Amino acid sequence: MNTFFKMSVMAGLLLAGQAIAADSITRADQIPQLHEEPQHATVSERVTSRFTRSHYRQFDLDQQFSAKIFDRYLNMLDYSHNVLLATDVAQFADKKTTLGDELRSGKLTVFYDLFNLAQKRRFERYQYALSVLNRPMNFTGNDTIDTDRSKAPWPKNVAELNALWDAKVKYDQLSLKLTGKKDAEIKEILTRRYNSAIRRLAQSNSEDVFQLAMNAFAHEIDPHTNYLSPRNTEQFNTEMSLSLEGIGAVLQMDEDYTVINSMVAGGPAAKSKALNVG
C-alpha cells in the first residue's frame, strides 16, 4: 500500500468519524440492539472449557458461582447503581443461576438482554441530564452527593433515579463553576459531554458485550484473569512490543471528533505534510 493511498484512507476515516459524530442521537431506537454473533458461541464454549479444566484456581461452575458472575456483570454495567431500576434487576432474578449453562452452551441470551436494557436506561438518563441543563443553576442549597454508590441499593423508581441525576448534574456544573466558567459556557460544555456519552452508546458492538461477559466470568475466577478480544489482543501485543504499523499517527477522540494526537517522526504521516497534530 503506497503512502498516498494510506493518507487518503486516513483522511476518509477522519471525515467519516466527524460525519458520524455530527449525527444527533435523540431516540432510544437509535441505540443498536446487540445480539451474539455466530463465532461467540464457539469462543464461549472453548473459554469455559479452558477455565473449568485448566485454571489454577479450581472452582465449580454451579448455580452459586453463576449467581456471582451475574452480580459482577451487573455491577460492571452499572457500577454506581444510578442507571438501572430495582425492577430492572428483579426481572432477571430467576436467570442469575443459569449463566454457567449459557457459558457452556455459548448461548449468551441473558448477558445480551441485560446489556441492551442497561444501554436503554443509560440513554434515558443522559436525555434527562440534558433536560436538567435547561434549568437555572442554583448552588444555594445544602445538597450532598454520594460519590460511591457501588454498595447502594438500586433506585426503586424513576423519581429516585432523577434525584440522583439532579445531584450528578449539579456536581458537574459546580465543578466547572469552581474553575471560573460562566453559566452559558458550563451549559455548552456539559451539553457536549452528555451528547458525546449518548453517541458512544450508539457505537457499542456485539464484541464489546461478549468481552464484558467473558471478563465478568474471568474476574470472578481470579481478578488477574482476563479475556481479550481479537482487537484488544492486537492492541496489547502492539503495546508490549512497542511496535507501530500504519501511517505513523496516533488518534484519539476529542469530544465529538477524531483528532491526531501525535505523529511518529519520519513516518508516512509526518513526511507527507498533509496531516497535522490537533
For every predicted segment, state its role.
Residues 8-16:
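Bacterial N-terminal signal peptides
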Residues 2-4, 21-278:
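Flexible, low-complexity junctional segments that flank or bridge functional domains
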